[in-house]
C-alpha cells in the first residue's frame, strides 16, 4: 500500500495523543541490534507484504506481494533468495496484506490475509488457508511457470461494526484462533477474533476483543504482526519499528496479552515496513519492506 512519510495529525485528534501517552514505553531490552541478513532481490517480489518462517521447514520463509499481483506465494531461504513461486489454488489476490502459519496434525498451513480495504469499499473479507508446499531447494519456477499448491480453503468473514482496513493477521499456534488488527491513521487499532471451529460455508462474524495502541504517532497504524511459536508473545509493526507484548505468567487466557505494555524493537532502515515474523524457533524476529530489493532484517533475542 502506498504511504507518505508525512502523517497528518489534526489538532483535534486528542484521543490519538492520549492513547499514545497511555501506551508510552521504553525500548525492549530483550533484543540485540537489528542486522541485515540478506536481500529479497527477486524481480517477482517488489512488495513483500507478509512474512512467515515455517516451523515445518525452518530454513524456508514465505512471502507474498500486496494488491496488484496474482495469487502467488514465494518461498525464500534465510538470506532472502527466492527458492520457488507457487500459485495458490482457488485463491484471488485483491489486496493481500499479511501472512501467518500454523503447525497442525496434518502438517503446516499458510493463512493468507485478504484483508486490505484502503477505500473502505468492501464489507466481506477472506483468509485463505492452504497446506504449505514442500520446498526441496531452488527451483526454476516463476510467475510464468509456477508450481501449484493444493486448493485453498476460503474462510470468509465480516466485522461486527464497520468496514475496516487491516494489514495484520495472526493465528494462535495452539488454539487456531484467528486475529485481525485494524489499521488506523488516527486512534487505536481494534483487535478482532474469529474462534477456531469457524464455518467455511458461510460468512463468519468477528468478535471485537479490545482496542490496542503502540508507543508511536500514529498509534494504531499497524502493518503486520506475528504470534511467537510458544503462543506467549505478539509482535506487531508499523512502517518504522516493531512492538512486542508478552503474556503474563498468571494470565488466565491469551486475550489478556492485549492489556500489556508494548516494548519497542528497533528494526533499522526500512523504506515501508509491512511484514514481520517470529523465527521458527522463536529466538529472533524477521522483517521485510514493501520495496524492490528489500533488505531482510533479523533481530535476535539476547
Language-model features and meaning:
Residues 3-5:
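C-terminal motif of bacterial Sec signal peptides marking the signal peptidase cleavage site
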Residues 7-302:
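Sequence/structural signature of beta-propeller domains
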